[in-house]
C-alpha cells in the first residue's frame, strides 16, 4: 500500500510539473499592428516532438498537432503555416541531399569516364601501332600479288601471239598446198611423174595438217630432181639426145686416143714420114669439125625439147612450191 501511495504521488507530481511547464510556456507575439507568433526554440522543439509523434511531417495535421501540443493561444492558422514551412524545409534538405548525392555520383561517373578514356587511349595507341604493322604487311602482300599477276598476263599474251603466228603459218602452208594441187589438177596427162608429184603433195599436206610445217626440204629437192630426171628421160627427143651424147663422148674418147697414138707415131717418124703426118693432121681436122657440128646440133635440140613440152610447167610449179616452203620455214624460225 505504501508503494501504491508513492506511485500515485509521483504521477501527480509529474502532472503538476507538466501543467506548470505549459503554464510557464507563454506565446511570444510581435509588436506589429497585426501581431504574429514568434516560434521560439522551445516552441519549435515542442512542435518537432509532436510531428514525430504523429508520424512525420507528411502525416501530421494541424488539428493533431494542436491536440498533442496543448498550448493555450496556439491556433490552427499558426500550426498550418509553420507545418508548411517545416515541410518545405524538409523537402529542400532532401533535395539538397539528392543534389549532393547526384553530384557525388556524377563526379564518380566523370572520374570513371576519365579512367575509361585513359584506358581507351592506351588501347587505341596500341591498336594504332598494330594496324600500322598489319597495313604494311598487307601492302607488301598486295604488291607481290600484283607483280605475279602482271607476269602471268605477260606469259599469257606471249602464248597468244605464238598461237596466232602458228595458226597463220599453218593456214599459209595449207593455201600453198591447195594452189599446188590445183596446178597439178589442171594438167590432163596422167603419167607417172604427175602421179608421183600428187602423192608427194598429199604427203606434205598430211604432214602440215598434223602440225609439222617445218619439215626438211632435202627430201623435197631430192624427189624433184628424181622426178625431173625421170620426166626428161621419158621424152623420145630426150632419149635421142642422150644417145647422141653417148656417141659424141665415145667418139671424143676415140679421137683423143687416136691423137695420142698419132702424136707418138709422128714423134718417132718425123724425119721419115712428113707427108703422111700432114695427111693425118688434115684428117684429124676434119674429124674435129664433124664432132663440133654434132655438138652444135645437140644444143638446139635440147633447147627445143625443154621449151615445148607441157611438163616444164610442172617443174616451174614445183620450183615455186619449194621456194614458198623455204619462205615458210624462215617465217617459222623467225617466230621461234
Curated annotation (Swiss-Prot):
Alphabetized Gene3D superfamilies for the sequence: Homeodomain-like (1.10.10.60)
Motif residue range(s): LHEQLE: 152-157
GO molecular function, one term: DNA binding
Domain HTH myb-type positions: 31-91
GO annotations of cellular component type: nucleus
Location of the protein in the cell: Nucleus
Residue ranges with Basic and acidic residues bias: 110-120
DNA-binding region ranges: 62-87
Record family assignment: Belongs to the MYB-CC family.
Protein name according to UniProt: Myb family transcription factor PHL8
Organism the protein comes from: Arabidopsis thaliana (Mouse-ear cress)
Taxonomic classification: Eukaryota, Viridiplantae, Streptophyta, Embryophyta, Tracheophyta
GN (gene name): PHL8
